[in-house]
Amino acid sequence: MSCKEHKVVHEAHNVEARKTPDHFYRSQPGPSYVQDIEQYRTMYQQSIEDPDAFFGEKAREFLHWEKDFTHVRAGSLRTGDTAWFLNGELNAAYNCVDRHALENPDKVAIIYEADDEADNRVVTFGELLRQVSQVAGVLQSWGVKKGDTVAVYMPMIPEAVVAMLAVARLGAVHSVIFAGFSSGSLRDRIVDAESKVVITCDEGRRGGKTVHTKKIVDEGLAGVGVVSHILVFQRTGSEGIPMKAGRDFWWHEEVRKQRGYLPPVSVNAEDPIFLLYTSGSTGSPKGVVHTTGGYLLGAALTTRYVFDIHPEDVLFTAGDVGWITGHTYALYGPLCLGTATIIFESTPAYPDYGRYWRIIQRHKATHFYVAPTAMRLIKTVGEQEISKYDLSSLRVLGSVGEPIAPDLWEWYNEKVGNNNCVVCDTMWQTESGSHLIAPLAGAIPTKPGSATVPFFGINACIIDPVTGDELEGNDVEGVLAIKSPWPSMARSVWNNHDRYIETYLKPYPGYYFTGDGAGRDHDGYYWIRGRVDDVVNVSGHRLSTAEIEAALSEHEGVSQAAVVGIADELTGQAVVAFVSLKEGYGRGSSTDTDPESIAPDVVPLDTLRRELVLQVRAEIGPFAAPKSVIVVDDLPKTRSGKIMRRTLRKISANEADQLGDLSTLANPETVPAIIAAVGAQFLKGKK
């Protein structure tokens, strides 16, 4: 597309809205909870114009309250004191376990897909109630009470879910720490949350490899006196696990001492249910605080309406409980609705790339929710496995974690869904608690690349980042913000409410700042651009880095691409592109980290750079062409698969000494190599 032809939200003009496939309706256990877009519009309008009536009714319909609330909401975004369901009392574990166990104790709650498929098992709601009660009894015997924080550092096993619900049963606050974090990162989070109890396991198993979980905990707690008790589940049963007398206790020994039922502790709707740490741009990670009533309702509503989940369905969320996706859509959402959830311990590549599809076939999963990163991996190296399995049970394919490119959306729909499923591209974040923008399966026509429409109560808007003014109408681009509170939004940052205000509410007073850029197309559909700081302004042209990355990725040799903006005296900002190459693309080790080792049959780096620049010029326009293209072995990513563009931006700006918190990186070894590559490339450019 040339500069003259560049349109606002131009992708929307290149795709057609997709109607719901007939297979979706034929395979439903019952009618859709929202029948069509007109019903959505009616419900959405009520949720915005009369949120007290809408959410008051939904809260009483979806949740069990020990004490009814007196007021639906109070406070505002401007003052940062939002509250929902005032004076109401409830318990999250009761809502997710007890009420379903009382109705049908033999119904399956958890389907466990272990690293080794021979270890698979299921947990019924009756069994889950007993296990949660027993672990809660252990914690109670150690003095854990309402408001205390308990750290959970476990792999994706049913006992991680049991631990979280046991903490919630006591009205305490769980702080789940991803089991891939280092001992130092674990220590920082335990100390910040002041967790006196840690729940962990002896070892973990992932991708056929052993993770020394308890050893990492011991290293993290060396010299830290805040923790008084550690509960250790025997995942592998390996001998020689060090246990500190008086502090460390075996799960199986302690639960034997407890009764099979412990009454839940009712808490106020605004009492915290959990805190979850996210990476900050500088300094230490921030513990985002979610509250019981609002969060639980958001989880239940979005699971029901976005995915059109029925009690008979099986939801396979391929996300870890160490992240918000696992919290909301592997645990609280499905279990609150009494729906079976698949807990997956392994990786999509172990023991082979057919693992996801065997899981779906074996358990007749109806819903599959996964990050685009995993689908890109399978598209590249494991696509041939898909056709070997019967995936006809699927009705809904979800995408989470980052915007899904239209071509990957199409591939996902065709190869995994056989064009029979609804593809739900969901936009949300740790701080939102549940979906912000997403199609309602069966009701909203979808568009490849678009997250579509706001969920109920999400008063979404587009703000001009320069003027701060709200942009009215359609065909607009800017910053995505929310202009009224919603139940599941985070209330604060643990022990640092000022940081919460500064990060989310101060940038645009009266609005919640998502940090994402977005466009609203001619149909009112939203297209997510990624983080606002991932928008580059070159000579007055606001360019989405995702758009440039998509153009780079169309080159036959590019495996992954990431684009950042750096200051430029002439154009204001300039585009810097980082690319890694596909295996076997005539590269040997010919990256910018090792530019001299080019084999005779490879494409020279300078030639490749020119091709990539021309690719972007042809796809978008001359104004979008990268000023520098840097070839690296790999890009820095979080453990949830997101590329850390902030890190690339800092390195490109010669601020490698200001990288901030890197604890969420899955591959920290990439950073020194990228620093060297950037230095070599920029020095070369000055010669």
UniProtKB/Swiss-Prot annotation:
Which chemical reaction does it catalyze? acetate + ATP + CoA = acetyl-CoA + AMP + diphosphate
Which GO MF term does the entry hold, naming one?
A: ATP binding
Q: Which residues bind CoA?
A: R206, G207, G208, K209, T325, S539, R617
Gene3D superfamilies with a match to the protein in the record: 3.30.300.30, N-terminal domain of ligase-like
Q: Does the keyword RNA-binding apply?
A: no
- The question of whether Nucleotide-binding is a record keyword is answered with yes
Q: Which PROSITE patterns match?
A: AMP_BINDING (PS00455)
The similarity comment for this entry is: Belongs to the ATP-dependent AMP-binding enzyme family.
This chain belongs to the protein called Acetyl-coenzyme A synthetase 2
Which species is the source of this protein?
Eremothecium gossypii (strain ATCC 10895 / CBS 109.51 / FGSC 9923 / NRRL Y-1056)
Give the lineage.
Answer: Eukaryota, Fungi, Dikarya, Ascomycota, Saccharomycotina
Q: Which gene encodes it?
A: ACS2
